[in-house]
Regions:
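Short amphipathic alpha-helix used as the core "switch/output" element in two-component signaling
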Residues: 78-91
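Conserved acidic segment of CheY-like receiver
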Residues: 14-27, 32-36
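As written
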Residues: 77, 111-117
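A short, hydrophobic beta-strand element within the central beta-sheet of small alpha/beta folds
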Residues: 91-105
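Active-site residues of response regulator receiver
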Residues: 68-70, 100
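Receiver (REC) domain switch/output surface
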Residues: 129-140, 145
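C-terminal output/effector regions of signal-responsive regulators
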Residues: 145-212
Length: 212
């Protein structure tokens, strides 16, 4: 039962994780690095361009990627996310956080097929980053069994685990329903996928359900 896991001890988790910061401004990269170090992170790499970031992800596997949406010239953060997903350089057990000053729905939603795990808006304070990272790391640790099966393309097993998580009264209900709909779609079960989208829209107005 996934939801019965003890609360994640973040102070013990940070030193074990690897981080990649992608931003075209050196001062911002340095600021984020200092914040992560203060949380206990020890393995922190940085990139100033999309090309360098994708190269790094080809040779190294990062647990957490913090990527600015607007990188100036070349690919933006959304395009990096899409390329990493398509080339399977970014596992579902990893976390991709989009950093953006943009607040429009078009940017926040991005390409519906490839969405980041979370967003953080500039300017970023240490408190805000610590809180957001803590939420995402806790979620990822609790849902790791599901994401591990997705990475292995064991979609039927992932569906079973998602259903168990929902039965256990998970706090990540929206994520589970969204993931279930995607998994049914991958298995060609459009009937169940459509049912989830419709059921969700009858209770809450969620962008991903409307897009589905």
């Amino acid at each position: 039962r996934l939801s019965t896991l003890k609360e994640v001890k973040l102070n013990k988790l940070y030193p074990k994780l690897s981080f990649l910061i992608i931003d075209d401004f050196e001062n911002f990269r340095s600021s984020l690095r200092l914040m992560l170090s203060s949380f206990g992170a020890q393995k922190i790499d940085t990139s100033s361009t999309a090309e360098d970031a994708i190269t790094k992800c080809t040779y190294d596997s990062y647990d957490v990627i913090l990527c600015d949406f607007n990188l100036g010239h070349g690919q933006n953060g959304q395009q990096i996310l899409e390329e990493l997903r398509i080339k399977k350089r970014l596992k579902h057990t990893h976390i991709f956080i989009m950093i953006t000053a943009e607040t429009s729905k078009d940017v926040v939603l991005g390409a519906r097929e490839y969405q980041p795990d979370g967003y953080v808006a500039k300017p970023i304070t240490r408190t805000v980053l610590e809180q957001r990272l803590g939420q995402l790391l806790t979620q990822q640790q609790i849902l790791k069994p599901i994401n591990r099966e997705i990475d292995l393309e064991n979609y039927a097993k992932a569906i079973t685990l998602c259903q168990q998580e929902l039965e256990n009264g998970t706090r990540y209900k929206s994520w589970c329903y969204q993931t279930l709909a995607k998994l049914y779609g991958l298995l060609g079960d459009t009937s169940n996928a459509t049912k989830i989208y419709r059921d969700v829209l009858t209770t809450r107005e969620l962008p991903w359900a409307r897009l589905g």
